[in-house]
Amino acid sequence: MRPIFIARLAATIAISAVIAAAAPAAAQDAPATDKRDWSITATGGSTIFAGTGDQPFASVGVTRNFGDSYVRLTGTYVDGGSDDGAPLSTIPASTRQMTLGAGTYVGALGVDGYVSLGDRRFDRRAFTTRTGQTIALDSNGASFGAGLSLTYEIPLGDSAVLAPFVAGDYSRISIARALALPGGTSMGEESREDGITGSLGASALWLFGPDQRHSVGLYAAALTSSNNSAYNGTNATRATALGIGDQPGVSDEWIEYGATAALGLSAAVDLQLAVVRTAGFLGPEATSVTAGVGFSF
C-alpha cells in the first residue's frame, strides 16, 4: 500500500494550491483493469486575515499520473476580498494564476516541484469606495513562483503514515499603493515584492473505512521568509495568500498548523476539507478554510 499522503493532506490552493502534491491514491492502488490515470479536482474557500478581512479563492486542477510520477496543471483565482482595517494606501487586487507541477517517488522519497505565472488586477473602484478618493492607475501587476519540496513517507502500520518534508520557494508579486495628490485625488504606484521562503515540517495521515477510502490528517510546519508579502502560498496547505494585505513585506518566521479530512464517496469520487492557520506571523494572522471534490478516471 502507498497511501498518497500529500494528495489528501494538501487538499485545498494554493493556493495551491491548489489540491494535491502527489498522485491520487485511487490511481496507484487500483487494479490494472481499473487503473485511473487522470484526475480533476475543484476547490474553493477563503483565507481570513485577523482584523483585515478575507480573500476568497477557487481553483481547478487536472492531473495525469505515470506510475509513481505525475504532472499537474492548476488554474487559481484569488479575489481581492474585503480589506477592513487595511491601510488607506492599500489598493486591493485580484489574482489569476496558472501552476504547472510535477513530482515522482523514489522508494519512500517524494520529489515535487512547480512553476506558477499569474496576473493581478488592481481594483481602483474598491479603493475609491473605501477612501472616497479617485485614483489614477493604468497598469496591472503580475505574479511568479517556483518551488521544490522533498517528502519522506514513514509507514505507521497498515493505515497511517508520517511524512516529514522540507521545501523552498521563490516568489515575486506586484503590489500597488496610493500616493496622495492635491485636490483629494491619488496616484497609484506599482512595485514588486520578491523573496525566498523555506519550510520544514511534517504531516500525518490516518486511513479508515471501506478500502481505506476515508482519511483524517494533521499538518505542522515552521517557515522562514525573506519577504512575507512575496510568499504566494501556492501550496494549498499554506494559509498565507497572494500579497498579504497588498503591502510591502519584511523578513519573517512563523508556524503553520492545520487538519484535513477526506471522504471517499466511491473509487472515483472524494470530498476534501482542509483548515490551516498561521501563528507568529508579523502581519495579520491567517486562517485558510478549503473544501473540494476530486474525480479520477
Enumerate the language-model features and the residues they cover.
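Repeated loop/turn-to-beta-strand initiation elements of outer-membrane beta-barrel proteins
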Residues: 68-73, 108-113, 160, 211-214, ...
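Outer membrane beta-barrel transmembrane domains
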Residues: 41-47, 52, 99, 103, ...
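Outer-membrane beta-barrel translocator domains and adjoining extracellular loop/strand segments
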Residues: 52-58, 75, 81-92, 123-132, ...
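Short glycine/proline- and aromatic-enriched beta-strand/turn motifs that initiate or cap beta-hairpins
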Residues: 25-85
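Cleavable N-terminal export/targeting peptides
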Residues: 1-36
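Outer-envelope exported proteins of Gram-negative bacteria
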Residues: 112-116, 151, 161-169, 215-221, ...
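Extracellular loop and loop/strand-boundary signature of outer-membrane beta-barrel proteins
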Residues: 45-48, 59, 83-90, 97-99, ...
